[in-house]
């Protein structure tokens, strides 16, 4: 093999290494460096907004903005004081107002704002036990919150008050008793987030 071919081969290998390295640095990549679990995202046209668990940090419930679901910028803090570990929030928009439902210190709360960038209200405590609240509007036009263990509770029209007792409406898939699992079956019914599309409700 002559020197010209060797030079071309070396240049080709170097180019391949550069392309591979460039791809590795750009995609896939870490979107948010740090501890930002349990994201809840809504879309408004070309804009996406997100919040996540903030646990024992205050101010908490950081609100993020993105136009591509890759690059996120913090724009607000929805929770100004700490009332317990905050986790598994649900960010929703209903009739022009933004709400974040979240559990903390053995209870459920909601904060709200007319502008996603704030100001956000003080926390409103809801008369509802359970964790991981998920907001949904029923076919009857009424508002509800799902919580863990397949339970649901009705909300007032403004979304700031529970108007009736919660009841179990979904018991999940009963896996075989001979399976070895951690804890009881109902402990896996957590984090209900709901979506209504084309006449169907989806729970994830």
Regions found by a protein language model. Name each.
Residues 1-26:
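Bacterial Sec-dependent N-terminal signal peptides
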């Amino acid at each position: 093999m002559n020197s010209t071919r060797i030079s071309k081969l070396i240049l080709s290998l170097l180019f391949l290494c550069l392309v591979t390295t460039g791809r590795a640095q750009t995609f896939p990549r870490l979107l948010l460096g740090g501890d930002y679990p349990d994201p809840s995202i809504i879309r408004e046209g070309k804009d996406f907004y997100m919040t996540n668990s903030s646990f024992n940090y205050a101010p908490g419930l950081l609100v993020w903005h993105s136009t591509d679901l890759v690059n996120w910028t913090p724009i607000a803090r929805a929770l100004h004081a700490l009332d317990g570990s905050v986790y598994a929030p649900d960010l929703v928009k209903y009739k022009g107002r933004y709400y974040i439902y979240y559990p903390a210190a053995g209870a459920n709360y909601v904060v709200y704002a007319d502008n996603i960038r704030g100001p956000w209200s003080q926390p409103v405590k809801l008369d509802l036990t359970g964790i991981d609240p998920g907001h949904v509007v029923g076919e009857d036009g009424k508002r509800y919150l799902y919580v863990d263990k397949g339970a649901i509770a009705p909300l007032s029209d403004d979304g700031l008050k529970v108007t009736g007792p919660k009841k179990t409406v979904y018991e999940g898939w009963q896996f075989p008793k001979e399976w070895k699992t951690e804890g009881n079956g109902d402990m896996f019914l957590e984090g209900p987030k709901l979506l209504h599309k084309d006449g169907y409700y989806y729970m994830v």
